């Protein structure tokens, strides 16, 4: 946790100059956006969250933030962004609250814990809550029900009750910074339509997936497919090298044949084959193996909940658990290539 906080602070310190000279200038000089919501609260200022906040400010929203990391909070305050000590205080200043947190337990605590977002359930100011964390659908639905049981302090247009959307993202840190994330959204469709301008300020694509929890379900399924695809691509490339085919040649074959996939043509796991991806920098940056292990655990729990057979989840869990135990938990998940091959790299 301490390492993660230090990494976030380092990213923020590099980001600070551009944030102040760019985002806040654009906010002060640009016309207000046409969305019905203007005051947005944001909780969770990690590697993804602080970049998403920057894009909200670029789009003209007035943002109030909170994080348990006081150093990050201080840095945002110094950049001219309003901060609050508790989630409840953020809610009091916001029409919409977005959360981007590490786990189901964190999300549950921020919503329903001491000084949580839903404190004073008969007097809630935000009409809309958007959770972009990657958590299990069951927890999402529990929190959504708790939100719907609250009452609004002031009714807005056709909003009789506050509403929650689950809107996890795909694209990682680079997409968060560029504002090109993909949002997978579950919840009432009218709330999704109202939230689209906010989502579009942080992402390129938003896909409505159905009722509450379906966004979370889509994210878990997407990451399961991503994990299995990476395992298959890594095993194929490792086998090819062992049989005497260079990884670059086999990659060309895959990418012009039926084996083509995101793991081969956009995120190749073999060092030296592709520039700008984690495998080209000793698997640093990107999506940590421990996070993939967490998401596979969520997929396994969800599969068990509905009685779905999941042999590939189990195998992927086993491999990523081993990778983490061997000290690769903070390395990008494409380092699983090392599980299959330890020969000479192409450089």
From Swiss-Prot:
Pfam families: NAD_binding_11, NAD_binding_2. Its main location: mitochondrion. Its EC number is 1.1.1.31. The active site is at 219. It catalyses: 3-hydroxy-2-methylpropanoate + NAD(+) = 2-methyl-3-oxopropanoate + NADH + H(+). Residues 1-34 form a transit peptide. NCBIfam families: HIBADH. This is Probable 3-hydroxyisobutyrate dehydrogenase, mitochondrial. It comes from Arabidopsis thaliana.
């Amino acid at each position: 946790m301490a390492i993660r906080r230090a990494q976030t602070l380092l990213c923020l310190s590099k980001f600070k100059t551009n944030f102040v000279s760019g985002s806040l200038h654009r906010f002060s000089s640009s016309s207000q956006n046409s969305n019905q919501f203007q005051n947005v609260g944001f909780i969770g200022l990690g590697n993804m969250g602080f970049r998403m906040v920057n894009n909200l400010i670029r789009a003209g929203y007035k943002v109030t933030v909170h994080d348990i990391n006081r150093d990050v909070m201080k840095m945002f305050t110094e950049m001219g962004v309003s901060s609050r000590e508790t989630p409840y205080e953020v809610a009091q200043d916001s029409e919409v609250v977005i959360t981007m947190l590490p786990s189901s337990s964190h999300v549950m605590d921020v919503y329903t814990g001491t000084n949580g977002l839903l404190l004073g359930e008969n007097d809630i100011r935000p009409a809309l809550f958007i959770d972009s964390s990657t958590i299990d659908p069951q927890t999402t639905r529990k929190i959504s029900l708790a939100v719907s049981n609250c009452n609004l302090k002031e009714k807005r247009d056709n909003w009789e009750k506050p509403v929650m959307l689950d809107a996890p993202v795909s694209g990682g840190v680079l997409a968060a910074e560029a504002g090109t994330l993909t949002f997978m959204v579950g919840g009432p469709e009218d709330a999704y339509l109202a939230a689209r301008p906010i989502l579009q300020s942080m992402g390129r694509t938003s896909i409505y997936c159905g009722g509450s929890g379906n966004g979370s379900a889509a994210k878990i399924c997407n990451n399961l497919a991503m994990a299995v695809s990476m395992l298959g691509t890594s095993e194929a490339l490792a086998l090819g090298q062992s049989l005497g085919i260079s990884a670059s040649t086999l990659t060309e074959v895959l990418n012009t044949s039926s084996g083509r996939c995101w793991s081969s043509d956009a995120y190749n796991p073999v060092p030296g084959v592709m520039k700008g991806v984690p495998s080209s920098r000793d698997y640093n940056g990107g999506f940590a193996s421990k996070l993939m292990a967490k998401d596979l655990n969520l997929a396994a729990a969800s599969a068990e909940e509905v009685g779905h057979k999941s042999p590939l989840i189990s195998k992927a869990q086993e491999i990523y658990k081993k990778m983490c135990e061997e000290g690769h938990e903070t390395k990008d998940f494409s380092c699983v290539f090392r599980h299959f091959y330890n020969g000479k790299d192409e450089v």
